[in-house]
Amino acid sequence: MSQNTGKITQVIGAVVDVEFEPGKLPEIYHALRVTNPAINDSENNLVLEVAQHLGENSVRTIAMDSTDGLKRGQAVLDTGKQICAPVGKKTLGRIINVIGEPVDEMGPIGNDKENPIHREAPPFEDQSTKVEAFTTGIKVVDLLAPYARGGKIGLFGGAGVGKTVLIMELINNIARQHGGFSVFAGVGERTREGNDLWMEMKETGVLEKTALVYGQMNEPPGARARVALTALSIAEHFRDDEGLDVLLFIDNIFRFTQAGSEVSALLGRIPSAVGYQPTLATEMGELQERITSTKNGSITSVQAIYVPADDLTDPAPATAFAHLDATTVLSRQIAELGIYPAVDPLDSTSRILDPQVIGEEHYAIARQVQYILQKYKDLQDIIAILGMDELSEEDKLIVARARKIQRFLSQPFFVAEVFTGSPGKYVELKDTIKGFQEIVSGKHDHLPEQAFYMVGSIEEAVEKAAKLAAV
């Protein structure tokens, strides 16, 4: 069979128009290949994905790499299939890019199976509805917004409040304890962070159970808009073909939307609210619906979601909210108090914070903690204007306990040891529940609040209080 070739008629940034012979138009999402000498010396090194049929035998495509160096009239080859990602155990311990090529200079992947990156979500009858919580070892998460196995979790936060550190701690804790395979998608984030993560994983021994897929900030929007789908294809293979429970980490899902917005404008679509693409909800839905649990295996996904200007009503984070089972909201106000992880205990939610799933005791203590923190928040205006002395004795007690709870929700992280000098702590769920139950019941009312800051279990807080008293 002769190969189907076309020629470039127009190049505008990351968008390339290609003309084919009559009756030979490639299908939407098909990958085309062209040689771009500006990238490297190899043949057909640039992949273009068909996005639109323009009429007059032309297609509009999105480039997955730099288009500098392309010329009008250049020959373009239709591969006759979608962009495919290498799947299977050979991808573990490797870093690949959006088109499935290794970028870690460790030679070819040598896999024998590939999956297309665009696929349908599993049908309803194949999906699993079983609900169970899994422990992360992070107190604030396990107590107030527990994560569901096979669920979707969003970490929301503005710039610099600790989303990537939290996601790295979750990889460290869950991947170590979970023992299964993980897939990490670096979507439009800093290359330095990607490098840090790779080094960290290598040192902790998690790397051989993780596949890394990177499309960083410096890549064209086409690559950033598709890299999450490449990672998802790898995770789907482990779930569907090998029947495993997989962890999928995406940092950052906002960059997926941002890249879609750039591409949408280049494709000539009229922008929607706040300049986002009109297809925002559809694109997010197509990605999120594929991240699900089936009767065969599960994908538990943790997604960092950047919140532009700390505005949770922005269309990008607001669209992601609808798909999530648990949300962990990071707050700048809490970060300013020096409390890390800077999780907002009143804004974070979980579908499984339900006595039927987590048990009566856990539920009751979580609600008591939220009540005390909410009461403290309500009293803050009075304290700011009139001072603590004007409060009733009961309110003074609530404020004292709330401040202890607030500090006890902080925790030293394993991945932050190099910055803080404090050894990381993994806290079992039973210890978390016991600790907060003791604070709420007033057992530790006599201890100073700084004893509860940056410790693991309640025993460590008591020990720290004894050391403080001895000074």
UniProtKB/Swiss-Prot annotation:
Subunit relationships: F-type ATPases have 2 components, CF(1) - the catalytic core - and CF(0) - the membrane proton channel. CF(1) has five subunits: alpha(3), beta(3), gamma(1), delta(1), epsilon(1). CF(0) has three main subunits: a(1), b(2) and c(9-12). The alpha and beta chains form an alternating ring which encloses part of the gamma chain. CF(1) is attached to CF(0) by a central stalk formed by the gamma and epsilon chains, while a peripheral stalk is formed by the delta and b chains.
Family: Belongs to the ATPase alpha/beta chains family.
TM spans (from-to): none
Swiss-Prot/TrEMBL catalytic activity: ATP + H2O + 4 H(+)(in) = ADP + phosphate + 5 H(+)(out)
Classification via SUPFAM superfamilies: C-terminal domain of alpha and beta subunits of F1 ATP synthase (SSF47917), N-terminal domain of alpha and beta subunits of F1 ATP synthase (SSF50615), P-loop containing nucleoside triphosphate hydrolases (SSF52540)
One GO MF term: ATP binding
Species for this entry: Pelobacter propionicus (strain DSM 2379 / NBRC 103807 / OttBd1)
Class of the enzyme per the UniProt entry, highest EC level: translocase
Function recorded in the entry: Produces ATP from ADP in the presence of a proton gradient across the membrane. The catalytic sites are hosted primarily by the beta subunits.
Entry's EC annotation: 7.1.2.2
Record InterPro entries: AAA+_ATPase (IPR003593), ATP-synt_VA_C (IPR055190), ATP_synth_F1_bsu (IPR005722), ATPase_a/bsu_AS (IPR020003), ATPase_alpha/beta_chains (IPR050053), ATPase_F1/V1/A1_a/bsu_N (IPR004100), ATPase_F1/V1/A1_a/bsu_N_sf (IPR036121), ATPase_F1/V1/A1_a/bsu_nucl-bd (IPR000194)
Binding-site residues, ATP: 157-164
Bilayer disposition of the protein: Peripheral membrane protein
Gene3D superfamilies with a match to the protein in the record: 2.40.10.170, Bovine Mitochondrial F1-atpase, Atp Synthase Beta Chain, Chain D, domain 3 (1.10.1140.10), P-loop containing nucleotide triphosphate hydrolases (3.40.50.300)
Entry's localization field: Cell inner membrane
Entry protein name: ATP synthase subunit beta 1
UniProt keyword list: ATP synthesis, ATP-binding, Cell inner membrane, Cell membrane, CF(1), Hydrogen ion transport, Ion transport, Membrane, Nucleotide-binding, Translocase, Transport
A GO term from the CC aspect: proton-transporting ATP synthase complex
